[in-house]
């Protein structure tokens, strides 16, 4: 095994993990990084593993919220305990918001990938779009907390998440931007976005897990995949913790500037 190849895969894992929580598109950065590192990773096995690593990190960060929602939601279903009503409704809204992207992703994933096959240029353009969206909401300060989310909010956020099926569009950006535009507090928008990420990522992992075992290069690249997976878990965990602080301070404009700079640079030099 070439040591340099191993290092490149670890760098990809760190990059994917770091960019997964923040609104700059992890998949887009993977495309760009593969281009500039001279790697040609075919199929979806590697990206699937990286997403699974990020999923584990998100579960660790939000384990208390998940436990509270599960306990209170079950309590409301079984005993109609009013204290659990808000959490039960929150769960229902998460399910509703999952449906649009889930259905379209399952039915048209191959068609979407084929349509946007010029990965590097598409990524550059979508980074510019993301930068513009983040710039437009830079000064928004919502007032809605978890218990004040409504059905309309869940539906709009769910359909907005479909935009993230386009390569290079950030999933967190595609959900946080409309959530804040609908008046959700930044911490509520962030929590809803990443709790929504869990069923989406879990469903995608389950549906595509056979791709990993049918990857003809799995034996050859087992160690690079493994180290990249571990790197993805660690990087996602710390990046998400950091992004929580950024959201609390309302400094999304920095991500907007970053997306503009990288998008323009890629269009010029790639």
Swiss-Prot record:
Keywords: Antibiotic resistance, Cell membrane, Cell shape, Cell wall biogenesis/degradation, Hydrolase, Membrane, Peptidoglycan synthesis, Transmembrane, Transmembrane helix. The chain crosses the membrane at residues 41-61, 88-108, 117-137, 192-212, 218-238, 250-270. Its EC number is 3.6.1.27. It is an enzyme of class 3 (hydrolase). The keyword Transmembrane applies. One of its GO terms (molecular function) is undecaprenyl-diphosphatase activity. One of its GO terms (biological process) is cell wall organization. InterPro entries: UppP (IPR003824). It is a multi-pass membrane protein. GO terms for cellular component: plasma membrane. Pfam families: BacA. It catalyses: di-trans,octa-cis-undecaprenyl diphosphate + H2O = di-trans,octa-cis-undecaprenyl phosphate + phosphate + H(+). It comes from the Bacteria. It is found in: Cell membrane. Catalyzes the dephosphorylation of undecaprenyl diphosphate (UPP). Confers resistance to bacitracin. Bacitracin is thought to be involved in the inhibition of peptidoglycan synthesis by sequestering undecaprenyl diphosphate, thereby reducing the pool of lipid carrier available. Belongs to the UppP family. This is Undecaprenyl-diphosphatase 1. It comes from Bacillus licheniformis (strain ATCC 14580 / DSM 13 / JCM 2505 / CCUG 7422 / NBRC 12200 / NCIMB 9375 / NCTC 10341 / NRRL NRS-1264 / Gibson 46). The lineage of its organism: Bacteria, Bacillati, Bacillota, Bacilli, Bacillales. The gene is uppP1.
């Amino acid at each position: 095994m070439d040591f340099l190849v191993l290092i490149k895969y670890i760098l990809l894992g760190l990059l994917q993990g770091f960019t997964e929580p923040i609104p700059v598109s992890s998949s887009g950065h993977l495309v760009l990084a593969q281009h500039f590192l001279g790697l040609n990773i075919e199929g979806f096995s590697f990206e699937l593993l990286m997403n699974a690593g990020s999923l584990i990190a998100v579960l660790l960060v939000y384990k208390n919220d998940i436990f509270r929602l599960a306990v209170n939601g079950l309590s409301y279903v079984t005993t109609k305990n009013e204290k659990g009503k808000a959490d039960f409704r929150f769960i229902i809204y998460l399910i509703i918001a999952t449906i649009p992207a889930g259905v379209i992703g399952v039915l048209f994933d191959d068609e979407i990938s084929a349509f946007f096959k010029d990965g590097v240029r598409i990524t550059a353009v979508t980074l510019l779009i993301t930068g513009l969206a983040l710039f437009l909401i830079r000064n928004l300060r919502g007032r809605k907390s978890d218990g004040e989310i409504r059905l309309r909010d869940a539906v709009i956020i769910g359909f907005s998440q479909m935009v993230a099926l386009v390569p290079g569009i950030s999933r967190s950006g595609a959900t946080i931007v409309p959530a804040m535009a609908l008046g959700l507090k930044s911490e509520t928008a962030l929590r809803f976005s990443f709790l929504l990420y869990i069923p989406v990522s879990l469903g995608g992992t389950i549906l595509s897990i056979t791709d990993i075992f049918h990857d003809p290069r799995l034996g050859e690249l087992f160690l690079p995949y493994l180290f990249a997976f571990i790197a993805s878990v660690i990087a996602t965990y710390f990046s998400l913790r950091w992004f929580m602080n950024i959201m609390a301070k309302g400094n999304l404009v920095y991500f907007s500037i970053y997306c503009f700079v990288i998008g323009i640079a890629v269009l010029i030099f790639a």
